UniProtKB/Swiss-Prot annotation:
This is Methyltransferase-like protein 22. Interacts with members of the heat shock protein 90 and 70 families; these proteins probably are methylation substrates. The keyword Methyltransferase applies. InterPro entries: Methyltransf_16, METTL22, SAM-dependent_MTases_sf. The keyword Phosphoprotein applies. It comes from Mus musculus. The modification Phosphoserine is found at residue 120. Protein N-lysine methyltransferase. Belongs to the methyltransferase superfamily. METTL22 family. It catalyses: L-lysyl-[protein] + 3 S-adenosyl-L-methionine = N(6),N(6),N(6)-trimethyl-L-lysyl-[protein] + 3 S-adenosyl-L-homocysteine + 3 H(+). The gene is Mettl22. Keywords: Methyltransferase, Nucleus, Phosphoprotein, S-adenosyl-L-methionine, Transferase. PANTHER family: METHYLTRANSFERASE-LIKE PROTEIN 22 (PTHR23108:SF0), METHYLTRANSFERASE-RELATED (PTHR23108). It is found in: Nucleus. It holds the Pfam family Methyltransf_16.
Length: 393
């Protein structure tokens, strides 16, 4: 028998998600230390609901009002550009188009007006950078701003406990952009998730599962590691007001991609009952995975698990995977490559070509042009892939 997923050892420095990295001046509430002694933080992710989407979700009429176009980020835009920046750029374009005078340098090139350097900059020879001063709040301190926003509009706030920088084997304890992209897609494709049974593989903090449960009947939120699953269970409890609105139930369970069978030991935390296993195989129609394609061995294990599961399901199903194409310079190639992404794509190709006479797999990319209801940087390297699994003709 091979090793468990949480026993795989990676030799790497700590990594930090871009979701947490690009939140300058945000108040980070540290709530506790987890079982491994890692600080756990509480962050709030605001849903930019419109009146129509709020009504469709089944929430009460006391929900938020229409979201103005100033608050809603356009699909495909990053959170790093303010609307003031966009309006200034538009103004510059209009100035050029109208033929007004444009400042040029001695070579005839556009003379860009630079922002004045701060007097406190210790090294004026280096390029200027914005000062970032994140505030770490102790557990006993009150996050008044966040609490007031939550109390005024609780159905527009997702609360997630997470860690910050972790070793590579613990990256599931952070929130990643791929999970936010997947959550946006879930909110957009209500028809696919309404009243169904969903299985998320490698759920991490559980954000996508929580969003899915606002529409789905049952969501099996799975991963490995007691500490991670316990944090995921806490996040489900923190957002029970959201899932209760749609009547969905989130069940946090252990599912190890490196093992053939589900854990049914009643003494083990997050194990499966026989009834839950029967429900999983009898009713699941949607499978999810967000940002879990960073190690070739685990990617192989996930695709093996996917194949094993769908052959046991009674219904045709759709799998939605999110992935970020990350570029790294490697000494082996002496070039910039994205090996983890390339291996993921190769695995998709192999799956589509699989012919066992029982099932056929249809793979296609999902264009990320759907509305953005969560604030994050939707970069072009973020991708969604859909796998439709049907009985072979």
């Amino acid at each position: 028998m091979g090793p468990a997923m949480d026993e795989v050892t990676f030799k790497s420095d700590t990594v930090l998600s871009d979701v947490h990295l690009y939140t300058p001046n945000q108040r980070h509430l540290m709530v506790r230390l987890n079982g491994m002694g890692q600080p756990v933080f509480l962050s709030q992710f605001k849903l930019l609901w419109s009146r129509d989407s709020w009504t469709d979700s089944g929430a009460e009429d006391s929900g938020p009002t229409d979201v103005s176009t100033e608050e809603m980020p356009p699909a495909g835009s990053g959170s790093g550009h303010s609307h003031e920046d966009l309006s200034l750029q538009a103004g510059d374009d209009n100035t050029i188009q109208e033929g007004l005078s444009v400042p040029l340098d001695e070579d005839g090139d556009l003379d860009v007006v630079r922002r004045p350097r701060a007097a406190s900059d210790p090294n004026p020879a280096e390029p200027a950078r914005d000062k970032v001063h994140p505030t770490i709040l102790a557990q006993e301190e009150d996050d008044l701003v966040g609490d007031q926003e939550y109390e005024s509009c609780p159905h527009s706030i997702i609360k997630i406990e997470h860690t910050m920088a972790t070793p590579l084997e613990d990256v599931g304890k952070q929130v990643w952009r791929g999970a936010l992209l997947l959550a946006d897609y879930i909110l957009f494709r209500r028809d696919l998730f309404q009243g169904c049974t969903v299985l998320e593989l490698g759920a991490g903090t559980g954000l996508a599962s929580i969003v899915a449960a606002t529409m789905a009947h049952t969501v099996y939120c799975t991963d490995v590691g007691t500490d991670l699953l316990a944090m995921c269970q806490r996040n489900v409890a923190l957002n029970s007001h959201l899932t209760a609105t749609g009547g969905g139930v989130v069940k946090v369970k252990e599912l190890d991609w490196l093992k053939d069978n589900l854990c049914t030991d009643p003494k083990a935390p997050f194990s499966w009952s026989e009834e839950e296993i029967a429900d999983l195989y009898d009713h699941t129609t949607v499978l999810l995975a967000a940002e879990v394609f960073y190690d070739d061995d685990l990617t192989n294990a996930l695709f093996n698990t996917l194949s094993r599961l769908v052959h046991r399901l009674k219904n045709a199903c759709t799998a939605i995977f999110s992935v970020e194409k990350r570029f790294n310079f490697t000494l082996r190639h002496l070039d910039v490559t994205c090996e983890a992404y390339d291996h993921f794509r190769a695995s998709l190709d192999s799956l589509e070509k699989l012919a066992d006479g029982r099932l056929r797999f249809m793979v296609e990319p999902v264009e990320a042009s759907f509305p953005q209801l969560l604030v994050y940087e939707r970069i072009r390297q973020l991708e969604l892939w859909k796998i439709v699994v049907e009985p072979a003709a």
